[in-house]
């Protein structure tokens, strides 16, 4: 069943930055269409910057259209230079192939087949580019591109303006490769709409032009906004780096905490971008939060929605449990897998061998600058061990969680996860 109001809803959510022909595209989407978005493998996992375009494909699927996710097994060997200050490092074919496999698995999980909806398609542009010779590429694709027009593109001009960097022919040719993707998908799958980030507008319009030249097809392009925070800074990274979708790189607990930390100025906008909550429910939540004193509900809703979407109900429950137990101080109820998540997330740790006493441990782990200060902290009740205030120095075997862990805390926020080796 086609949703005739899809473009209007996407616009009201703030998800449309540029649209090649808003009126014609709205008419075009009145019947089932095929839409694609490309994802180049630049690492072994997608990160939250990929979520908005990936979820956009899901929105089109729910509206009655066929989504196509393209993983760039060929373009990933080159790297998109769009608005990059320096030349990308080239990765080996083996590395890129491994990344393609990882990203494909993540995309399948987030873009599932659903009863009554068009089945999502996953393609790899290495399947057609790998079979094309350089001569064929130059004759069949290159002849349709004007170097004059390519040189005035903003992303190219920025690089040419830097004599210390410039742009290689390899990266200069990237737009031709992405354009060929659109033409191939139009011919093979009937794809008539490409979506992508706002920095992809030049590549998308080039692909539209090539497709029209090669196949005389009417095709469209649409970009999504660059996601920034209210203060204008780029969204999606922390001091520790990117927020990955792979739980081995960013644990579900850290993922959950990231969304809980969303600023009040951003949270309702991010609910419109990242969640499938109806706009009326988001507006009602914002109105309810405006009446509340203290912490808003929206951050909790956002964290719950996104953690369950990416990691599942079980991981959400674990993240909620860890958060609750750390906040309440009932850390003795943490499971060993919970402690492993905390260690993965970068909770400061300390590994020791053999026996020690609490004063020495406080100093060696960095929670106290000297043994005198350590004893003063203990006497003042400022040190907790596994969630309980500790005033005594001796450590007992029974203090160890699962026989090998201690969770020390000084004050409210300074934690050390101590682990006995062996």
From Swiss-Prot:
Keyword vocabulary terms for this entry: Aminoacyl-tRNA synthetase, ATP-binding, Cytoplasm, Ligase, Nucleotide-binding, Protein biosynthesis, RNA-binding
Residue stretches making up the S4 RNA-binding domain: 356-420
EC number per UniProt: 6.1.1.1
Gene Ontology cellular component terms for the protein in this record: cytosol
Catalytic activity of the protein: tRNA(Tyr) + L-tyrosine + ATP = L-tyrosyl-tRNA(Tyr) + AMP + diphosphate + H(+)
Motif segment ('KMSKS' region): 234-238
Residues annotated to bind L-tyrosine: 36, 174, 178
Gene3D superfamilies associated with the record: HUPs, RNA-binding S4 domain, Tyrosyl-Transfer RNA Synthetase
Keyword Ligase: yes
Enzyme class: ligase
This protein's record includes keyword Protein biosynthesis: yes
Subcellular location: Cytoplasm
Motif placement: 'HIGH' region: 41-50
Gene Ontology biological-process annotations: tyrosyl-tRNA aminoacylation
InterPro entries: aa-tRNA-synth_I_CS, aa-tRNA-synth_Ic, Rossmann-like_a/b/a_fold, S4_RNA-bd_sf, SYY-like_C, Tyr-tRNA-ligase, Tyr-tRNA-ligase_bac-type, Tyr-tRNA-ligase_bac_1
Pfam family, one: SYY_C-terminal
Subunit structure and binding partners: Homodimer.
Classification via NCBIfam families: tyrS
UniProt record similarity statement: Belongs to the class-I aminoacyl-tRNA synthetase family. TyrS type 1 subfamily.
HAMAP family for this protein: Tyr_tRNA_synth_type1
Main function: Catalyzes the attachment of tyrosine to tRNA(Tyr) in a two-step reaction: tyrosine is first activated by ATP to form Tyr-AMP and then transferred to the acceptor end of tRNA(Tyr).
UniProt protein name: Tyrosine--tRNA ligase
Gene: tyrS
